[in-house]
């Protein structure tokens, strides 16, 4: 059975087993086809609409291992886990044996030995997950894994909640004009979103300081626009990115010296003038946290075209669907 929501997007109201995603792990949007994304969004909408949560046949223990700071993602995953009936075991990196030199594989091996079957991990190293999902010869770790962000690599749960927010608004992706603005080089959100939006048929544009734009990497996914004012009136979605000062080290250190908050806001920030230039049905998004007065003028964060709070709300249900996909993929708790 299907129904139509207030914004005319067709959503599922019944538990359709044939459309459920099943994955051994969820680490990158590169795992997903366009159909996979739509099925995941349908499932997330099912949960958002109050759909019945599948009953587990036995307790499933999980843990959230965040080696980088997080408010939205960490809390959202824990809410999602508890809604699904999982037993959440606390993990604090600052009080773990990681500080004694234990590597991530051995930390996960410890968790698996204690009966934990699912880990949600955020880690500063790009593609940290490879040592967990592709054990070396002689290693036997079995662990369900959801990637909550790896360095500047991937952020699949943020990408999926962004897709849900866009889909709820427009009912499709094909031909939508979406501009991603800001610290592109250092953004895992930009990478995940440009890949999946390309798969879904959207027209992607990029803007931001040229020292944060790598044409070799980004140009195959969209068009770089130097002056965002040239495109703003045509956009369906304006997606702002946080300036990630904590990643401006090493080879990126020189960009921190070039950066000026006032200049950035003048060139790329969402102010009242640019807000008024947007179409009436355009929406503004941001993965958070927001640097108010830099990427987004503070008095516009909750303006009518903003979907910032909606994104965060959708995140719980998307993460429920992602976790369920891994539970089913690994046949945990009687789910298949």
UniProtKB/Swiss-Prot annotation:
SUPFAM superfamilies to which the protein is assigned, alphabetical: Aspartate/ornithine carbamoyltransferase
Gene: pyrB
Assembly with partners or alone: Heterododecamer (2C3:3R2) of six catalytic PyrB chains organized as two trimers (C3), and six regulatory PyrI chains organized as three dimers (R2).
Keyword annotations: Pyrimidine biosynthesis, Transferase
The keyword Transferase appears for this protein: yes
Reaction(s) this enzyme catalyzes, per UniProt: carbamoyl phosphate + L-aspartate = N-carbamoyl-L-aspartate + phosphate + H(+)
Pathway assigned in UniProt: Pyrimidine metabolism; UMP biosynthesis via de novo pathway; (S)-dihydroorotate from bicarbonate: step 2/3
Superkingdom of the organism of origin: Bacteria
Protein's UniProt name: Aspartate carbamoyltransferase catalytic subunit
InterPro entries in alphabetical order: Asp/Orn_carbamoyltranf_P-bd, Asp/Orn_carbamoylTrfase, Asp/Orn_carbamoylTrfase_sf, Asp_carbamoyltransf, Asp_carbamoyltransf_Asp/Orn-bd
Purpose: Catalyzes the condensation of carbamoyl phosphate and aspartate to form carbamoyl aspartate and inorganic phosphate, the committed step in the de novo pyrimidine nucleotide biosynthesis pathway.
Ligand binding (L-aspartate): 100, 188, 242
EC category name: transferase
Chain sites annotated for binding carbamoyl phosphate: 72-73, 122, 155, 158, 288-289
Organism the protein comes from: Lactobacillus leichmannii
BP term (GO), one: 'de novo' pyrimidine nucleobase biosynthetic process
Family under the similarity heading: Belongs to the aspartate/ornithine carbamoyltransferase superfamily. ATCase family.
Enzyme Commission numbers on file: 2.1.3.2
Keyword Metal-binding: no
């Amino acid at each position: 059975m299907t129904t139509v929501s207030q914004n005319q997007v067709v959503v599922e109201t019944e538990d359709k087993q044939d459309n459920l995603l099943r994955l051994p792990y969820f680490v990158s949007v590169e795992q997903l086809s366009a159909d996979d994304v739509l099925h995941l969004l349908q499932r997330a909408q099912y949960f958002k609409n109050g759909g019945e949560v599948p009953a587990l046949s036995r307790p499933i223990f999980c843990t959230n291992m965040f080696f980088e700071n997080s408010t939205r993602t960490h809390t959202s995953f824990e809410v999602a886990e508890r809604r699904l009936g999982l037993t959440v075991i606390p993990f604090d990196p600052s009080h773990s044996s990681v500080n004694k030199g234990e590597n991530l594989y051995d930390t996960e091996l410890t968790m698996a030995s204690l009966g934990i079957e699912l880990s949600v991990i955020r880690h500063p190293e790009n593609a940290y997950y490879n040592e967990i999902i592709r054990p070396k010869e002689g290693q036997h770790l079995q662990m369900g894994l959801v990637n909550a962000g790896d360095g500047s690599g991937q952020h699949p749960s943020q990408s999926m909640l962004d897709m849900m927010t866009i889909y709820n608004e427009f009912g499709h992706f094909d031909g939508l004009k979406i501009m991603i603005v800001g610290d592109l080089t250092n953004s895992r959100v930009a990478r995940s979103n440009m890949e999946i939006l390309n798969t879904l048929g959207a027209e992607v544009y990029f803007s931001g300081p040229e020292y944060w734009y790598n044409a070799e990497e980004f140009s195959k996914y969209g068009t770089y626009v130097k002056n965002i004012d040239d495109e703003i009136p045509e956009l369906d979605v304006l997606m702002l990115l946080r300036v990630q000062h904590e990643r401006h080290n090493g080879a990126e250190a020189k960009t921190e010296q070039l950066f000026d908050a006032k200049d950035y806001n003048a060139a790329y920030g969402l102010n009242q003038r640019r807000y008024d230039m947007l179409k009436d049905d355009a929406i503004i998004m941001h993965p958070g946290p927001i640097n108010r007065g830099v990427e987004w003028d503070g008095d516009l964060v909750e303006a009518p075209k903003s979907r910032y709070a909606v994104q965060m709300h959708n995140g719980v249900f998307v993460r429920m669907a992602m976790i369920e996909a891994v539970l089913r993929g690994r046949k945990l708790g009687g789910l298949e």
